[in-house]
Amino acid sequence: KWLIFDRSLLKRTIAYGWASAMQQATVQLGKIGVQAIVNTMGVSVAAAFTAVNRIDDFAYTPEQNIAHAMTALMAQNKGAKRNDRMREGFRCGLVLETIYGILIFIVCFVFARHLMMLFVKDEEVIGHGVTYLHLISIMYILPAITNGLQGFFRGIGDLKITLISSFVNMGLRVLVAAPLVLVCGFGIEALPFSYLAGWIGMLVA
């Protein structure tokens, strides 16, 4: 029986796969756009941005893993028609995301210089990285929340919302960063504010 072709299941799988693929493509295109803007700021800023991206990746990974757990929990309980568990799981997931966002803010803000020194030794590069981390760490609670929300919507099968919100997020990052850097002459400090605009836009979307 496991070889029986299920047309409706195939359509659903393709729809989910397409939405997920487009979401990932959108994120990567946004990162390319931001990197292109960073490259106009000089070698030191580009080096600092490379280092802080690694720190960001470490910071975001637990947030994403909590969101993946929320996705699995939502999907299982939606299938079981346990809306009460879905509500409780969603609430607990957001609480965990928020607590983690606060903790990682403290770590990255207080130890910004030490974290940068793990990757680079040049004082100018470290200075740029510390500036970035002091600003972005304050905002870490926002991606924690947006990751939790995306985990929820993926779990209930509404991937269009996650696709649209990711498109808004990455689009606003580039649209805000470009004039701040290329027109107003801001440095690496412009990037956290462009990310802030993206995360707020993501929540609104």
Predicted features and spans:
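Short alpha-helical transmembrane segments in multi-pass integral membrane proteins
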Residues: 1-17, 74-139, 181-205
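Hydrophobic faces of transmembrane alpha-helices in multi-pass small-molecule transporters and flippases
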Residues: 2-33, 37, 58-62, 66, ...
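Transmembrane alpha-helix boundary and packing residues in multipass membrane permease domains
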Residues: 20, 24, 32, 36, ...
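Alpha-helical transmembrane segments of multipass membrane proteins
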Residues: 23, 27, 31, 60, ...
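Helix-terminus/linker motif at the lipid-water interface of multi-pass membrane proteins
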Residues: 25-54, 58, 76-77, 114-123, ...
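Membrane-helix interface segments
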Residues: 44-45, 159-160, 187-188
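Small-residue-rich hydrophobic transmembrane alpha-helices
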Residues: 48-112, 143-157, 161-165
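Short runs within selected transmembrane alpha-helices of multi-pass transporters and secretion channels
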Residues: 67, 136-155, 161-173, 190-205
